[in-house]
Amino acid sequence: MRTARMLWMLALAVAMPATYAQTAKWPDKPVRIIVAAPPGGGDDFVTRLMAPKLAELLGQQFITENRPGAGGSIGQTLVLKSPPDGYSFLLAGGSMAGARYVNAHVTYDVLRDFTPVSHLEISPFYMLVHPSVPAKNLKEYISLARSQPGKMTYATLGAGQIPFWAALLFNSMARIQAVDVAYKSIAEATVDVLSGRVDYFFAPSATYAANQARVRAIAVTSAERSTMFPQVPTIAESGLPGYDMPAWRSIMGPAGIRRDVVTSLNAAIARTLAMPDIREKMLLAGSQPVPSTPEELTKKYAEWIQRFGKIAKEAGLKPQ
């Protein structure tokens, strides 16, 4: 009896550290959010805006750490290889759902290798054309492009980015043939749109805001009009019903993060995105706050993986 009791106590003592670790308070040190893009962009804006509020709610610093490069894979890999302790998260974009269709070196599975936390926001892209393009609206542009198959050009930021997918979907639904001109940065693409060297570019809100006098916005890629420029119609209402290809962002961590950590961070994100000052700043920047449950985020990624797969198949894309 004594031997059995001693063995039970020994087992309990061994198990206690693990049990304690599973229920330990979180966070008890700063939390980092990896942004797989350079400072100063839309990704950076969202995390830096939210960080002070998350710190107030959860009692620890939330630090934005920019890790750009290799189309986002440097930052993504860093998070994948981080311990699932709740102190490293990724600002994940919707484009991750389509990465495997264009990049043969992508080894991760979004649904298997990441822990979903919360959806954050939706940001439309604006279809910008040079004023010399003789099309005042989307229907006129489609008619123009159909009359010149293979001659119209459009700027993208390389295979796999949302403007790339937005253009492929647009060309397919509009039944037009156009030439993709890839650029390394938004700035370079914008210069060529402003000069008329390319015909159109799906650009973020900030690009249109800074160049309204020099370009024409004929449509936005989201299902609803932007709060920033509500006068610009959606592609869907301009003749291509069902079109919807905005940028969207979420927070994810490496696979295996404790459920209570996910629940705490998810609740803090929802509260932050509901704060009037946060909502106002995001809306003014053309970003629509849209929190979610982890389950809703998983469902959205699954749906977009299928969407990108269909677009890739129709376009004949092969991973490079």
Each model region followed by its residue ranges:
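Short, low-complexity disordered leader/linker segments with a strong preference
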Residues: 1-28, 320
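N-terminal (or domain-start) structured segment
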Residues: 21-112, 151, 159-162, 173-202, ...
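A short C-terminal helix-loop "cap" of Rossmann-like NAD(P)-dependent dehydrogenase/epimerase domains
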Residues: 28, 55-59, 174, 227, ...
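An extracytoplasmic/periplasmic, membrane-proximal ligand-sensing/linker region
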Residues: 28-30, 173-176, 259-320
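Structural signal for conserved beta-strand scaffold positions within catalytic alpha/beta enzyme cores
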Residues: 66, 91, 116-119, 156, ...
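Hinge/capping helix and adjacent helix->loop/strand transition within the periplasmic-binding protein
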Residues: 81-87, 101-188, 235, 248-281
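C-terminal lobe and pocket-closing loops
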Residues: 122, 206-274, 303-306
